[in-house]
């Protein structure tokens, strides 16, 4: 999709200007057909997505009042709005002077939009032109398309060809494909074998090429031993990863894994978000397979190789 990012507010103009490229021709068709627009009151034809449709307002709170666009895949891959909002506020608290955020697998724009609520320059990358289209349309519905720039491309190719390195990013975020709902079939999620488009070690290394501050949203059953090994292999034997277990409506949704000094050296009690969000403390078992010993107040605990917190985004 060209060498540069496309401003989300000018995506139609950019598509027409570059219509000789196949991806832009596809984009023009999507725009002309108003494709993938969700009718909030009408259940989806795909019955397998019904449980996600029931929770549609958790994905996008404006789904009843504004135009929201999602492909079938995005129904189970978009970060719920409260969780995306929590993360954006958390990053803002840790990096109050940050300006530029890169969202590597932007999907339908769940995280991209919330980052744009907090930061003036947000860049979204995705392999799918349909996802780029959905992000742009959803950003328009939330009124933040003037803060978002988008680019279609394979993450492997973009990194290997250094097509993103001209911009200095304050933080790189990514919610890489987990492999669909099937990720919960195993008790422990293999971060080297099942994470796409590459294992956790290569993924971390590729993100760190663009910024020393990195965040990934990973499955709640991720193998934390693999996470520790990847951290030490890429950053050295004494490096640690900050892990935030995130709950919504009493259910664990996933973990935010963070690398960068700013995520360790911050004062949570001083932020509006932290006053609003309640959190609990839980210890990881030696096998990292179960959480226990819950407490009501926010605290931080360290395992051998990671720092672990748990937050409930509902307060």
Curated annotation (Swiss-Prot):
<feature type="compositionally biased region" description="Basic and acidic residues">
    <location>
        <begin position="273"/>
        <end position="284"/>
    </location>
</feature>
<dbReference type="GO" id="GO:0051321">
    <property type="term" value="P:meiotic cell cycle"/>
</dbReference>
<dbReference type="GO" id="GO:0008033">
    <property type="term" value="P:tRNA processing"/>
</dbReference>
<dbReference type="GO" id="GO:0071164">
    <property type="term" value="F:RNA cap trimethylguanosine synthase activity"/>
</dbReference>
<keyword id="KW-0539">Nucleus</keyword>
<comment type="subunit">
    <text>Monomer. Interacts with the spliceosomal snRNP core component SMB1 and the snoRNP components CBF5 and NOP58.</text>
</comment>
<comment type="similarity">
    <text>Belongs to the methyltransferase superfamily. Trimethylguanosine synthase family.</text>
</comment>
<protein>
    <recommendedName>
        <fullName>Trimethylguanosine synthase</fullName>
        <ecNumber>2.1.1.-</ecNumber>
    </recommendedName>
</protein>
<feature type="region of interest" description="Disordered">
    <location>
        <begin position="271"/>
        <end position="315"/>
    </location>
</feature>
<feature type="binding site">
    <location>
        <position position="126"/>
    </location>
    <ligand>
        <name>S-adenosyl-L-methionine</name>
    </ligand>
</feature>
<dbReference type="InterPro" id="IPR029063">
    <property type="entry name" value="SAM-dependent_MTases_sf"/>
</dbReference>
<keyword id="KW-0489">Methyltransferase</keyword>
<feature type="region of interest" description="Required for correct nucleolar localization">
    <location>
        <begin position="1"/>
        <end position="58"/>
    </location>
</feature>
<dbReference type="GO" id="GO:0005634">
    <property type="term" value="C:nucleus"/>
</dbReference>
<dbReference type="GO" id="GO:0001510">
    <property type="term" value="P:RNA methylation"/>
</dbReference>
<dbReference type="GO" id="GO:0032210">
    <property type="term" value="P:regulation of telomere maintenance via telomerase"/>
</dbReference>
<dbReference type="GO" id="GO:0036261">
    <property type="term" value="P:7-methylguanosine cap hypermethylation"/>
</dbReference>
<dbReference type="GO" id="GO:0017126">
    <property type="term" value="P:nucleologenesis"/>
</dbReference>
<dbReference type="GO" id="GO:0005730">
    <property type="term" value="C:nucleolus"/>
</dbReference>
<dbReference type="InterPro" id="IPR019012">
    <property type="entry name" value="RNA_cap_Gua-N2-MeTrfase"/>
</dbReference>
<comment type="function">
    <text>Catalyzes the two serial methylation steps for the conversion of the 7-monomethylguanosine (m(7)G) caps of snRNAs and snoRNAs to a 2,2,7-trimethylguanosine (m(2,2,7)G) cap structure. The enzyme is specific for guanine, and N7 methylation must precede N2 methylation. Hypermethylates the m3G cap on TLC1 telomerase which affects telomere silencing and telomere length regulation. Required for pre-mRNA splicing, pre-rRNA processing and small ribosomal subunit synthesis. Involved in nucleolar structural organization.</text>
</comment>
<keyword id="KW-0949">S-adenosyl-L-methionine</keyword>
<dbReference type="GO" id="GO:0008173">
    <property type="term" value="F:RNA methyltransferase activity"/>
</dbReference>
<keyword id="KW-0808">Transferase</keyword>
<dbReference type="Pfam" id="PF09445">
    <property type="entry name" value="Methyltransf_15"/>
</dbReference>
